[in-house]
Amino acid sequence: MGSCCSCLNRDSVPDNHPTKFKVTNVDDEGVELGSGVMELTQSELVLHLHRREAVRWPYLCLRRYGYDSNLFSFESGRRCQTGQGIFAFKCSRAEEIFNLLQDLMQCNSINVMEEPVIITRNSHPAELDLPRAPQPPNALGYTVSSFSNGCPGEGPRFSAPRRLSTSSLRHPSLGEESTHALIAPDEQSHTYVNTPASEDDHRRGRHCLQPLPEGQAPFLPQARGPDQRDPQVFLQPGQVKFVLGPTPARRHMVKCQGLCPSLHDPPHHNNNNEAPSECPAQPKCTYENVTGGLWRGAGWRLSPEEPGWNGLAHRRAALLHYENLPPLPPVWESQAQQLGGEAGDDGDSRDGLTPSSNGFPDGEEDETPLQKPTSTRAAIRSHGSFPVPLTRRRGSPRVFNFDFRRPGPEPPRQLNYIQVELKGWGGDRPKGPQNPSSPQAPMPTTHPARSSDSYAVIDLKKTVAMSNLQRALPRDDGTARKTRHNSTDLPL
């Protein structure tokens, strides 16, 4: 069934193995690059490669994952072994990989956002303009490594803010005709629903809420009119609504273009999505905690014919996926000039697998590493769909190198030895140079070669005398009070 490989023997893994799947890595254009065996353990994804070390992606470090037909792909965070990137694998059992990964996520109490519900900007928190339509289970799953109290399995599964994303963001490995992409309304208002798995989780969720992101102050005064820009929080029985302000990039763009002359003290830290081009139509994002009844209706699907969609089926939902881990700079990035040497060494350059549009648009990115969320910023500037074509990513490597070899043996270290002069220290040696400050003049003339190589001289007679003196001191039985003034008595 599967179209993938094995780390040691390609035929050693059966086609119907419950946790191991034969996969083939592909790039943005669908070109096969290498094969391996994808194994799903209780805590991480493991890719076994031929003649190479296994590559591991912990579930807590996965940002999102999904499948389409025979293609399974996921996005890894910066704390993974491979760093930040999007990886796509071709496999006939892609749906089984997705379902198994989703079950493992839920067993490990890792939040999965599956059911987007749309609330318009001007609606009351308790009034929905559109029916609550959960996403089917075969759609994209999104994972975050955040818990309400810092411990997995306790409290409600809320989402913690991570970074802003774009309205054109969709699943990286799925084509333009993907059936699993979410559709957004005209105003780009989004609701992210957290559904507890049981009634016990829901009862616990009423007393424990996720801390607000930095820079969002709850219960702001509502005296600024309909065009207020500050983030707001509305607490209602059974739901919490967060209204976010514009992003710093959007404020800067509006200020440069002169579309919006004044803003009401926008916050410095916010996580809302890309704003529309007009200031009065500022989008608002709503987060709602819904009971388990919504989960039971998971068979519903959002359709463009619903009221309020206006037939905009080409619009993609802005998928806000969050994680509360501090970002780390990506590691194990391979450069294009290093790939030639790897191809000659292994004899198979297609073993170096690549993430599907794994980003790193070095030539087009103009922000600091800590402000770079994903490669979707380049998609905004080019007004193209995700993923970004390779021809437009001039500074990024084409193939992601998975060759994580163990470091070789360290070079031998240089050892320095102390030269001990055993000859020439007899009784005929003058006793004059007893002063430590005066240099020992006879040494350079008698042994010039040895003196140039050595950096220390040991007086053996003096060492033996001091050792004998210490041995002759009276032993302390523990009854005498010893100080530095009364312990210097020398034996007779």
Swiss-Prot record:
Domain IRS-type PTB, residue spans: 13-115
Annotated Gene Ontology cellular component terms: cytoplasm; plasma membrane
Gene3D superfamilies membership: Pleckstrin-homology domain (PH domain)/Phosphotyrosine-binding domain (PTB) (2.30.29.30)
Keyword Transferase found: no
Pfam family of the protein (one): IRS
Task performed by this protein: Adapter protein that links FGF and NGF receptors to downstream signaling pathways. Involved in the activation of MAP kinases. Down-regulates ERK2 signaling by interfering with the phosphorylation and nuclear translocation of ERK2.
PTM description: Phosphorylated by ULK2 in vitro. Phosphorylated on tyrosine residues upon stimulation by BFGF or NGFB.
Annotated region described as Disordered, given as residue ranges: 153-173, 338-455, 467-492
Keywords linked to the UniProt accession: Lipoprotein, Membrane, Myristate, Phosphoprotein
Gene: FRS3
Molecular function terms, GO-annotated: fibroblast growth factor receptor binding; identical protein binding; transmembrane receptor protein tyrosine kinase adaptor activity
Protein name as catalogued: Fibroblast growth factor receptor substrate 3
Native source species: Homo sapiens (Human)
GO biological process: fibroblast growth factor receptor signaling pathway; signal transduction
Complex formation: Binds NTRK1. Binds FGFR1, NGFR, GRB2, PTPN11 and ERK2.
Subcellular localization(s) per the UniProt record: Membrane
